[in-house]
């Protein structure tokens, strides 16, 4: 451990003499802005309403025309078929995951609606929905529900690393993100 160097009496007197008449500097060059609250803190009531609104699109009576041969896939008419190819190849990696194992059809619809609402709110354009194998009820219904939602651009059977034929990768249409205004 190093010893502190002490100043001699002469050096201390010289220092006090040189510092006589000085005053403390007022900090006026850097202004620290107050930290803003996170935008993602959404009230619970709004989350419940978004979930209910998003699950409104899912009907059990309507049967969209989906290709039954090969892997499960869908592309909205106004979207390029190349997007489904990108999903199949794994070019998009999902940021949000939803596991539907053990849920009823009603619960699964509500959770799908909540997932789509969360993707739009958080500006996430790719999500993974794991429906599992089970009794094939959710496996059959999930693509039918997703094809009905207007914000679903495309979906494709997930690559092996995301669940294979027991999961779907979904492309969600998100609004253009603008940074919040600094005031």
Swiss-Prot record:
It comes from the Bacteria. The keyword Hydrolase applies. Pfam families: Smr. Residues 98-173 form the Smr domain. PROSITE patterns: SMR. Keywords: Endonuclease, Hydrolase, Nuclease, RNA-binding, rRNA-binding. GO terms for biological process: rescue of stalled ribosome. The keyword Transport does not apply. Its EC number is 3.1.-.-. GO terms for molecular function: RNA endonuclease activity; rRNA binding. Coiled coil: none annotated. Acts as a ribosome collision sensor. Detects stalled/collided disomes (pairs of ribosomes where the leading ribosome is stalled and a second ribosome has collided with it) and endonucleolytically cleaves mRNA at the 5' boundary of the stalled ribosome. Stalled/collided disomes form a new interface (primarily via the 30S subunits) that binds SmrB. Cleaved mRNA becomes available for tmRNA ligation, leading to ribosomal subunit dissociation and rescue of stalled ribosomes. PANTHER family: DNA ENDONUCLEASE SMRA-RELATED, UPF0115 PROTEIN YFCN. Belongs to the SmrB family. Associates with collided ribosomes, but not with correctly translating polysomes. HAMAP family: SmrB (MF_01042). This is Ribosome rescue factor SmrB. The lineage of its organism: Bacteria, Pseudomonadati, Pseudomonadota, Gammaproteobacteria, Enterobacterales.
């Amino acid at each position: 451990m190093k010893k502190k160097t002490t100043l001699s009496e002469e050096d201390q007197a010289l220092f006090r003499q040189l510092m006589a008449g000085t005053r403390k500097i007022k900090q006026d060059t850097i202004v620290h802005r107050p930290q803003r609250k996170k935008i993602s803190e959404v009230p619970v009531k709004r989350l419940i309403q978004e979930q209910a609104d998003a699950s409104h699109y899912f009907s059990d009576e309507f049967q969209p025309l989906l290709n039954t041969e090969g892997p499960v896939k869908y592309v909205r008419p106004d979207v390029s078929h190349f997007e489904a190819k990108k999903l199949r190849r794994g070019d998009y990696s999902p940021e949000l995951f939803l596991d539907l194992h053990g849920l009823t059809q009603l619960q699964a619809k509500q959770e799908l609606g909540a997932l789509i609402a969360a993707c739009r709110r958080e500006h996430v354009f790719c999500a993974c929905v794991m429906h599992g194998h089970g009794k094939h009820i959710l496996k059959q219904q999930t693509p039918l529900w997703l094809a009905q939602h207007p914000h679903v651009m495309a979906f494709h059977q997930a690559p092996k690393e995301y669940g294979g034929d027991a999961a779907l990768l979904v492309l969600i249409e998100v609004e253009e993100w603008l940074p919040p205004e600094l005031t």
